[in-house]
Each structure stands twice: as structure tokens, then as C-alpha cells.
């Protein structure tokens, strides 16, 4: 065994001072001293349990001892009589075995392959033991779940990722998917439950047993987000539901995840074989599938952007040449050829890599370099995590942990270790780039005129600028020169290293050449230099623009077209990554795919890291907003589609925010107990105004109200029990907090909840019954007008149906025409006096006479006036489709409805484009005269003369 290095010998003295009397220094072996010096986790564990150290010294860890885990665990659980006891014993067993694994790993008593096997087998044994204990307990409580033939139904657990591949790292969360075979009901219990209820409750208890922190810690952090539909999907699915999902909706990334899926525990049963056979066609295609390369390239691009966004340059998993790239290389061959080559269907990386070499898909040399690099990186990763039992892949910056890793990896010092590490990662990167690297080859230095370089380097005399800037006016020439000079002065105030200077000197001549070719060069350059000032100290973003000429061209054209986009990019430079792929930049996410895209995006963020979750939500929104704006500018999205995309995006964000708030509240208080007998959450979010009407703009806030259906006597079922209605109030407050918290990426949305019953003076969240009562007995006419544009944007089916029924009932009430006309007209006049244009010779597109609000009031008046006779008028909440309904139901002439629709979309289109130019929503008085005259005539007809 290698002696401790000098820094570690010094640190040993600090360790000695912590040791209790039973662990006196003189009684410890050299091995014990080495491990205690290396790992604070082992040190803390044996201080709490000195008998573990005695056991380690007398019975050192063996390579094959994973075969005994099941028997050891069975003995540990033999006297467990309740769930609390189960949780305690599982946590202690996991910690005891992890100490043994850390000991073996630190001293290199066993191979790295053996360490990965032991870590994975330990997790599997703990998961299966917890499942089996809880299954018996739940059967005693509720009966045994059976199918229609009376056959008992088990809970099958798919271990995903490294757990499934038998390659779990030292401090890892576990990705699981729960499934049961067939529908049916429980038999033999005090009361009957259907199988879905049984397995959902059992699954919730299993997650709690494994995941909930106690004074003994936790067993594993459990991540269920890989299941169908993610967090918004059922916790447990039947085989039939799983099959339907993967056949009809399974995404490429879910296919990649399923490559490593492995059934935990006894995997030779009938149901296990059925599940495996069902999933295999989804994962391994019968034909050779080259579409995989582009899909994996896209995924790698997402990860590269994540590395840049979170500054993960020293990350041995996600960084260039890291563990993830080796996994991608192997998966390419599995997914392209695995359907035809059974040897490629292994879940584990190293056997698959051997099969790839045997099939001559990679050269023997490349395969061997990848194998050696993988084992080196995995050992380094596991050692790094075993220092503090901490889930990290980022190399340390402190001297102590660097000394620890250098010693444990058998190097003299840190530079020697990083030298070998760099060589391994370079080998991986080379193979990765040859196989699934970027489409574009490395960009060559373009032959730029020396004058552009001199212009940037400030060597041109004033007269010498004429050739390169000759097409610009004299004022623009002067402004361009001044902008370059000001930018260079700004650079002198900032700390930019040699690398940053070098990248800038390469980038700026290209940028100036492209910008100055434009007629609007001065305006465009002013917007781009403002952006560059914000990123000059972040060399990775400069490199992105320097190395990808296409990204630079997109940046220039977008900044020229829209100051809003320019300022967004300046505030949030991580959005620059979106410029890399024009296929996605000018092609927004499909309207029905925002939820799934967001779900995939959030999977990369730890579920329990609230700060990162908040950042990720905001960054996703900004990236999607950029795509929508880019498509709008390019003319590929008409105004109606712009609002559709902005609305679908907002709904996806609402869905994710409610999910996060719900998880946080349930973790703190448990669920309201009235939900035990029903599906759903008993909660709904209703969108009013532009959100309700599918008419969001780029900077629209969200008008929301919150409803629940919680009975007065309901309580939550957690350890910190609170009143059920108090739970929903806190849930709504949490949702508001998640929307409005300002992070480095800004806020998510401004949320206005004042349209709730009694406005700002009312409760933030209202019961469904109280909402209905208020609308029937207390609401003003303007509140009924608002209801015309309201719809549920998040909610379980029961509450959604209840709201829709109340809305329909209120809108179809008989109303006296003259009274309604007067009330609507007076409300509009009040608004115009309060909000109308204060600028002479200007037309406020939204608030002035003949503008958007007049059209909205006309449609709302006509729905409230005639829905009693024509209930179909209540179907839609957006103005365009309401105008269609008015024509279809013979309330309004078709010609008038179409003319109002054209006026409405024209005015809204102008508002969108003014927002892109960061201009207020008013225009010259002589604009849109025909549209305004048409709206005035319609207003006169319906709200004055009728």
C-alpha cells in the first residue's frame, strides 16, 4: 500500500483529534489510517459506529461479498415490525455496506468493475427488500391486488440509468419506473381498492421509505421523472398503459433511457419476461437506424449548453471527453444496430464496448482507449464522491481534496493526475467527434480583408475607413467608429485573459465585416456591442460566436430586427446557444409539445434543488420565447400562431410550477386526506384575460385565480398535519412565490390574482362552491364579462368540469338587453378615461376608441346578451372563435364578424411587432383608420343604438 503523501500525513493529525477513545491511533492499522484520512464519510461513520471498523479490520471487504448482501439484509430486517423500523434498518445497512465499499475502493482491494457491481447490487437489494416488506404490509391493510382471474399482481420496478446497467456510482440518486401487470381489485382486505389505487399508495410509501431524510439519513434519492408523462403522469402504470405510451408517444430520449432499463429483483418470472418482451421492440429497432446519430448529437448539444450554462468545465461526467460521451458512443452502436446484433443489447457499457470491437465497428485501439478511459474516469468519480458521500462530478479546487484524489489514484501530485486525465478525455473526445461530432467541420480562418482587422485594432486613419465603410452615410460611419472605440475602452476596464483577447481578435473582424455590410450598421452594432460587453469575461460564449459563423449571422440578423431580442440576449447570454441550430431557432416547439420539452429539460436538474429548478424554468421560457420571436420576425408564424405558442408555453410553465409547489407542500404537510378516495389533486388554476383567451403577447402577465374542492373537515396526512383548506392556501402562495421570485434569470411571469372573488380583499384561493355562489349572487357585470375569457389552464377533470358548468350557467343567465348594454358601455367609458392614450396625435392600439378593447367588449356583451338563447356561444374563450360563433348562430352578419376578426388580428400583430421593437403600444394618429372606423361603427350598432 502506498504511504500517505505529505499533505495527507499532516491532515491525519486533524483526524486523530476527532477520534473517540475506542479508536485510539496506536490501535489502528496503516490501512485504517489511510482510509480515515481519505474519506470524511468513512471517518464520520466509524466514529458513530466503532464496531464497523473492528469488523473491517477482522473481515476485510472481498470482491464477491455482494453475493451475501441479501442474506445480511434479511437478517437485519428480521425483527422489523413497522415502517419506522424498516426505514431505520435500511439506512443503517446501506451506510454500513457503503463504508465497506469505500474501504475496498480507497485501498484498491478490488477492481473498479467490482466496485460498480457492488454499488449496483446493494441498491437493488435495498429497493427489493423495501418493496417486498411494504407489499406484504399493504396487502394486510387493503387486501392482495388481483387480476380478473384472481391471480395476485406484483409491483415490478425498472431500474434505469446506471442502476439498470449495473454501473451505479458511489453517491447516486436512483431512477425508477413502477409498473403492475393487469387491472383488477384487491381481495381479502377490509375494503376493496382497484389495483391502480393499491399500487399508487404502495409506490408513494416505497419512495418515502427510501427517500425521506431522517436522523439516520436516507437510503437513496429517488427520481421518478423518467416514467411516462414525467411528474404529471401516474406514479404507477399497468403494462397496457406502458405499452400504449411507448408505442404511441415514446420519445427518442426515452428510447435511449430504456436501453439500460432492468427489472429489479427476481427477473425470471412470467410477468418480468412479459414486460421485457413488451419493451424490447421500442428500444431495439429491427432495421439499422441512422437517425440515432442526429438525435444523440442533439442531446449532446443540450448537455454542452448545460455545461456552459452551469460552468461545468471541470466536470468529468458532462465535460468534453467525459463519462457521458463514452456512454453516447456506445449507445450509438446499440441503437443503430442493436435490433440486428443481440451482442449489442447488453445494459452494461463494458461488455457492449467489447461487442462493438468484436464486430469491428470501432478499431481495437479506439475501443481499448475508451475502456481504459472509462475505468479511470469511473474510479476518479467514485473516489471523489466517497470523500463526503456527495453526488458530484466536479473536480475539487481545494488542496486537501486534490491531494486525497492524487494519492488514491496513485499519482505523486495533482498536476500528474490532471495530465493523465486530460489525455484520457482527449482520446474520448476524438472518438466522439469522429463518430457523432458536429456536422460542420472546424471552421477555417476566412480570408478577411486586412482593413477589417485594422479597423478592429484601431490602426486605421480616419480617411482609411472609406473603402470598408464607403456605403454608409457620413453620420453612420462616424457612429460605427465611435461604437468600436467605446467598446475597446470598455474592454480595458474589464479583466479579460489572454485567451479571451485572442478570441475577440478573431471574432471582431468577422463581426464587423458582416455588420457593416448592412444599411443599418450603426444601429445593429450598437445593440451587439451592448451584448458583447456583458459576455467579454465569459470566453466560452465568445468562442461560440467565433467558431460558429452561422450563429454569428443569426445573432446579427436578430439583433438588427429586434431590440427586444438583443436586450434579452444581453441579459441572458446562455440564450446564445439557441443560435447554433437554425432548425430549432426559427421553428418553435410544436404547440402540443411544450410540456414534454420542459419535462425533458427539467430532468437535468436535481428535483430537490429548488434554486436550480427556478433557474431552469426561467431559462427554458427565455429560450422558447427567443424561438417564437425569431419565427415571428422571419414571417413563419402568423399573429394567431404567435399567441398560440406564447399561451401553450405559459401553460407548460404553469403545469411545472404547480407540480413543484405541490411536491414541496406534500413533502412538508402530506396530502389533504379527501384525496385518498379519488384521483387528482382537488386544485385548479383558471386563466383569465389574454391567457384565458389564447391571446398572450411577448410581455403579457398572467391573470390567474385558484380553486379547490376541499371539504371543511379535511386535514393533511403528513407528520405536520394542517387544515386542508390551509394547505391549498399555502399551495397558492407557493405558486405565486415560484412565479415571482427574481433569480439571475429574472422572474418567470408577473401574476395578477385580483380577478378572484372580492378582488385583492378576497382569499387567494377559493373553494369551487364559494366561487359559484359569488358568481351567482355577488359578481358585477364586468366580472361576468371577464368570465367570458376564462378557462381552466391546470386542474383535475372533476374541478375542470365543475368550473366549466358554473361558467356556462352564469353566461347563459337571461339578461335585460338595455341594462346590460348600459353597464358594459359605462365600464368601457370608465376604462377609457383611466387607461386611454395620454399622447396627443397618437393612437393607443389597445385602449383608445376603435382599438382592441372595444372589440373585446363587443364580443363579451354579445355573449352575455344572447347565450341564454344560444348556449353554444359559451364554447370558446378567445375573441376570434367567439366572432365565428356569433356569425354561425346568426347574431352577427358573417361579413361584419370577418371584418372585426381582420381588424382584431391586424391590431394584435402590430402590438407584437411593437413589443419586438421595445416600443410602446401607440402609433401615429393616422394609422389603422379603416380598422378603427369599422370598430367604431360596430360599437355604435351594438352598444349605443340597439
From Swiss-Prot:
Region named Adenylyl transferase: 449-946
GO MF annotation list: [glutamate-ammonia-ligase] adenylyltransferase activity; [glutamine synthetase]-adenylyl-L-tyrosine phosphorylase activity; ATP binding; magnesium ion binding
Catalytic activity, reaction form: [glutamine synthetase]-O(4)-(5'-adenylyl)-L-tyrosine + phosphate = [glutamine synthetase]-L-tyrosine + ADP; [glutamine synthetase]-L-tyrosine + ATP = [glutamine synthetase]-O(4)-(5'-adenylyl)-L-tyrosine + diphosphate
Positions of region (Adenylyl removase): 1-440
Pfam families: GlnD_UR_UTase, GlnE
Required co-factors: Mg(2+)
Enzyme Commission number(s): 2.7.7.89, 2.7.7.42
Top class in the EC scheme: transferase
SUPFAM superfamilies the UniProt entry points to: Nucleotidyltransferase, Nucleotidyltransferase substrate binding subunit/domain
One GO cellular component, as annotated: cytosol
CDD domains: NT_GlnE_GlnD_like (cd05401)
Keywords: ATP-binding, Magnesium, Multifunctional enzyme, Nucleotide-binding, Nucleotidyltransferase, Transferase
Highest taxon in the source lineage: Bacteria
Gene3D superfamilies found in the cross-reference section: 1.20.120.1510, Beta Polymerase, domain 2, Glutamine synthase adenylyltransferase GlnE, Nucleotidyltransferases domain 2
GO biological process, any: regulation of glutamine family amino acid metabolic process
Function of the protein: Involved in the regulation of glutamine synthetase GlnA, a key enzyme in the process to assimilate ammonia. When cellular nitrogen levels are high, the C-terminal adenylyl transferase (AT) inactivates GlnA by covalent transfer of an adenylyl group from ATP to specific tyrosine residue of GlnA, thus reducing its activity. Conversely, when nitrogen levels are low, the N-terminal adenylyl removase (AR) activates GlnA by removing the adenylyl group by phosphorolysis, increasing its activity.
Family: Belongs to the GlnE family.
Protein name: Bifunctional glutamine synthetase adenylyltransferase/adenylyl-removing enzyme
Gene: glnE
